[in-house]
Every structure is written in C-alpha cells, then in structure tokens.
C-alpha cells in the first residue's frame, strides 16, 4: 500500500530539481511567491506538536537572531508557521507529512508527531544554509519559496551505526552524530558499545567491565607488510579507553528520542567479548587472565556457555533494558570462532546435554535462549546473520536478522518469516575506502565503496516474493572505527555516503536518480560546512 501510494504521488506530482532537499521528497509542486521569516513570525502548534515547535524556534534563533514565539493560536500575526496533527493524513503513515508554503503561512501537517518533525527538517533545508549557524548572520533574507510537499518514507528502518569500542567517541560527538541522522531523516541509531577492544557502558553489577574492560594498553595503527605477519604490526603505544556512565546513556537516549530516533544498543555475545573476559576471566573458556585486545580482526576468545555466563549476559541486559526503551536489543552474534568450544569441557557437556550436533548449533541455542528471554520482557533480539548458522529452531518469532555478509542471510531469514535489516558490506560499510587511489585516502580497514555504489543499493532482494519482502524493515550504514580514531575521522568516512544511503532508505526506488542526487548534494554540502562536518569533498 505504501509503495502504491508513493507511485501515485510521483505520477501526480511535478518533478522538481531546484530544491536541494535530501532525502528527495515523494511529491513536490512549486508555487509562486515566497514566505519571509521575520521576528514577528509566530510558531503555532497543538498540544502534540508543542515540543517540536520549541525545537524549531530554538534551531532558527541563533542564526536569525529572532526569538520566535510558540503559541497555540496565531493571534494577529501576519506570518505563521503552523505545526498540526491531522487525523485525515493516516495514509501518509507514522512518519509522513504535508508541507505547504505560501506568502503568509507555512503549514506542516502529519498523522503523527514524527511526521511533523520530518516536515520541520525539510523546512530547515528550504531555508538558506546559514540557517544552521549557531551565531547571528547579518544581511541574510530568510525566505522560503512557495511549495507543496507530500512525503513519506519507503522503509521503517533507516539506520546508522557507530562503533565506539575500537575507538571511544565523546558523548558530545555522539549527540552531534544523532543530529546529523535527524537532518537526513534517519530514525535508528545502532550504538556498538562492547567488543574485544573495549567495554563502553557502565554496568553497576559488574564494575570491572569498565574499570578494566574499558581500557587497553595501546592500539594497532598500521601494518608494514602482510597482515598475517604479526611482527609487522605497528602500535601507537598510547593507552586508550573511556566509557559512558548510565547517566550519559540516559542523556543520549533522551536526546535521540527528542529527534524521533530509537537508540539500539549492541552488547556482543558470545564472540567479540575479550574486554568482558579480561574483566571477569570466569566468562572465558581457558581460565587465563587476558588483556583488553589492542589489535583488530577476529579473536578466538569467546564467552563460555555455562549457566553462570548466561546469568551474566542476562544481568547485563537487565541493566541495558532499564536504560534503553528500544524495542530492539542487538546481541551481536557475529564472528564467534568455535575452536575454544571444541576443547571446552563445559561447552561439550552442554552439547551432549542438549543433544546438539555442532558448536554452531550451540551458538544458535544460546541465541535462542537470549531471544526468548528478551521476548518475555517485550523486546526483540536483533543479531548479525551468523546467528542463523546453527539453524533457526528456538529463535523467538520476533527476532530480527541484520544481513551483513551479503544478502543471503537476509533472504533466508525473510523466507523463514523473520524481519531483516539489510546491511551488506558491498553497499553499507563506510569503513571501506572511498577511492582506489589509496595514497590520497586515510588509512582504512580495506575494501572500496564509492558514493555511487551506496546510492545504487536496492535493499529488497529480487529473490523475495511480495509477502517475504514485507519482512525487509530497511537498511543501515555501518562505521567500524579500527582506524577512525577521532570524530573528524568518523565524519570523513561517513559523509557524504550516509547522505546517499538516507535517500535509499526514504525515497521510492522509482524516484531515485543519481545525477539529480549529486546536483542536490553539491548544494547540500553547504549545510554540512556550516555544521562543521568533515565530509569527504566531492569529486
């Protein structure tokens, strides 16, 4: 129904390439005249949109110097910006909106507040780029061309990931990242909080997770020759670490909620767990005292499948659930080598006890236990596609698969009735190089992912029929931070590729056009400049 409506909007609309709005709206009709924003303009809201009205006034205030009043009625104002819930717009869904600009009024209406918020984000892009500045800009006429836009997203999951384990990122940057997601109408922030190289979230029941697990001696910064020869690895000899307190997490979650973004935490299990094992050696399989890992790649140390380790995972998730209202809780599940389980008396006893036939089946059993535990608390487990390797038996029906090793995992999960988020390395891994001229590129993990390849991505595999395709929730961009050591490095790798993926996730496939996108992008980067985003310059 959503796709049919989008097509009807496209047929009925007038194609417009003069507005540099990203993602490209479904339907745009240009009018005549302009709306002039003045100090006397009133932001008019109803009760459901009041906070969005305050946000809009706060966002416009620094650059314009105007303190726009927010009111439930226009009074005698000659020019108004009206934000309203409209029950007749149910056909636009939870996040769609209608924006109308005339000479005297800007009206944003939607079925739900999220739609009003996205209409506001579009309005901000209709203003001059200087509207994003945080200080008064003299001499600017704050005008918006007359237009009517009717818009709605193609996918419900429009995400961006951030790995803060390999390289810890300050809380203020995390909030800036969330602002940039909101600007591009992305609604899922996947926060990768734990891994071999660092545990980044305070868990009160297990204080050593951050006292020990959040810190490492140094970091791998390069390889002189072949990666397989560890004698050629180069370290920086600089201690690295950090973590977010539970108050920090609450602050970030509230900040995202105000921007209609769901924060999806990732707590890795059973692999990528060396930081946890370094803090509590009884979680491992060897009993050895480990250090937090300082190099990259797949590590052999994984959590053991004992009752005590399972209770640990549940204890951690109990505190995580109290911090994150997200329906989805990511438990990783990727890159969990089974060599230690093959020689572990505990793991082998568990396999015999359950009548399993392999270590992969043991991981699937463990994932099923966690998915059912989460389902019993009203949440859905989401994991990387390796969670399918031992079969889907026992996996809670509401469990979601994130397909990163190509699209086959997503296809298999969707065909089995599970929701999926499509995240293949080929189109969504922003830690890959942006050019094949590596001498001009900062160090990256490898690969090659140019902007055009991101934009060309189609998240719904042709192998799925119309019923199975409904299980594709959407797509998401990933940034792993092995070599992205600071916020500016992250921004360089993510932007503008995330801008392209935002359009993939929002705009109907038949409305996409790379030449048109790049034309709008060349004007859109003026906004990124104002926002001090260290994006890769366009060719």
PLM features: residue spans?
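Contiguous, structured surface segment used for ligand recognition
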Residues: 14-157, 478, 489, 497, ...
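Flexible loop/turn segments at secondary-structure boundaries
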Residues: 51-52, 168-170, 196-202, 270-276, ...
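Sec-dependent signal peptide recognition
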Residues: 1-7
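Active-site neighborhood of glycoside hydrolase catalytic domains
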Residues: 276-282, 286, 290-399, 404-416
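Feature activates predominantly on carbohydrate-active enzymes
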Residues: 90-314, 318-328, 369, 373, ...
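Flexible, acidic glycine-rich loops studded with aromatic residues
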Residues: 380-388, 393-399, 403-539
